[in-house]
Amino acid sequence: MTGMKNKQEYEEELEMGKGGFTLPGESGYEELTLKMAEKWGADVIRDSDGTVLSDEITHAGYGIYSTICIIRDHNAWAKENQDKLQQTFLCTPPQAAESDTLTIGLMDSFFAEQFRINDSAESLEYWEVYDRTTNVKIDNADWSYDKEKGSVSLSGIIPFHKYTVSFLAYRIWEEISMYNHTTNHWDKEHLMQIDPRYPETQEYLLGWMKHWCETHPDTTVVRFTSMFYNFVWIWGSSERNRNLFSDWGSYDFTVSVPALQEFEKQYGYRMTAEDFINKGQLHVTHMPGNAKKADWMAFINDFVISFGRKLIDMVHSYGKKAYVFYDDSWVGVEPYNGRFQEFGFDGLIKCVFSGYEARLCAGVDVPTHELRLHPYLFPVGLGGAPTFMEGGNPTLDAKKYWNSVRRALLRAKIDRIGLGGYLHLVEGFPDFCDYIEKVADEFRLIRSFHDAGEPYRIKTRVAVLHYWGSLRSWTLSGHFHETYMHDLIHINEALSGLPVDVKFISFEDVKNGILKDVDVVINAGRAGSAWSGGDAWKDEELVTALTKWVHEGGCFIGVNEPSAVEGYDTYFRMAHVLGIDEDTGARVCHGRWIFETADPEHLIPEGAGVEAKENRYL
């Protein structure tokens, strides 16, 4: 039921109009739950954050998904062990000094319900004060911390220079619960998140997991949401700027004193606050990383696998399957780094708005691939727009998202789809219920096509070239509405439904000979970004390999500022291949070739266009 099925089973389900669908059930709405399970052809019923399933539902003959967030819902233990909450480095905004002294309030700019200063002796060893005018670290003797006021006072500094304080803070409200709480106007206790980096936390969680398995005999699949560390989401104190920083792929929320200490022992050098804060910019996934970031990511991945495997093995020992949600606390799981199979997961679930996210799920080596469709059954959607409430149109939302996702499903097989949220909200939207019935039937039909054979592909083999390579296959850092400003996400979305083989390669891959298996290379992004490549283009071996490959028949496609880096005869290092370069000001007095622009028929679809760029020349 929850694993892979043979063709006959799929055909039988297709004929009966059921299977491959996960329905969010809700205690108190048993009749509705079973009615919609029949209408949508569900074979599995799940709970959601804030809902439970009654015995009537769990004993109705369906598979049961139970959702657990392993690091939250432990408030009783967390209150007794507040030194074992998860942490992060925060950095105050730059503040200009008017004299040789300055006092900076640490929490003035941050959401007090999300963070609390960690001012333990071990934590203070990692705090740093910087002169941001010179970007020089201030000696510890020149600043002091006032515990009662939550502030740092500087002395002997330079007037009218800017200063920041980087400090460790406990995260006292789990971010996804915080979002759901504020979005749905819940009135209940804030959930804290505990850090399994501590041996005491590990012992507690293993005991909790054992008890949970024993007290949930009807559960067939345990859905981990997800592992231990959430993507970064820092809220501000002002409602006018609540979302200070969010990055789906960043590792800032994995920091703790014991993690920093263990890293130093294992890698032989000490990570500092500035290694994370990075002049206040943090290490955005959209920018190239460095060796220290790579080491930290590998270090966290080692830990998440080692302790995560213990929990998964326990779930398996009770005869249950273990699926993981590829969102929320996914950091450190890294399904595309070549080690994902070490977890032992039976399935992967990805929430999707777009085709590229369906391909992101389908490309992971795991027995079962499942998509969680939007819109979620919430009163409001992401961004606060009304959904299942007055003024909302969830049917239109569902059509928009399904149209984006469906084309990708024709290219790569997905085993299951489903919804999440509060089922009772659909009662006022019968057209939505009818449309999801159609979606479920379409999905089962598409799935049956894959059982008949591989989809048709043309011979062209496409490679998307950027800093992260295969580690960030298909995605950049989050959903489309979070990354739409980047050219590459539009390209990924287009590729997700095209009949071509697609791979994602790094600059090192090029130097190691991967181009022999590629017909087209796409490099797309703003200069200096991870997607264009930044300083990677200073490598003559890279430029030579690509030039030779094009000479032998390869096709190099550049978008926006491909191969851009300063310091050479051309701004685009591949200008000799592209036939075009960008003038950054150095060629303002030079002559230019005259050319005419034309729109070739059938090259650009009706209604679409290509944005013109200034300062480009032949």
Region spans (language model):
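Glycan-processing catalytic domains of CAZymes
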Residues: 2-532, 536-540, 550, 558-560, ...
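A glycine-rich, often tryptophan-bearing local segment used as a flexible ligand/cofactor-contacting loop or short
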Residues: 533-615
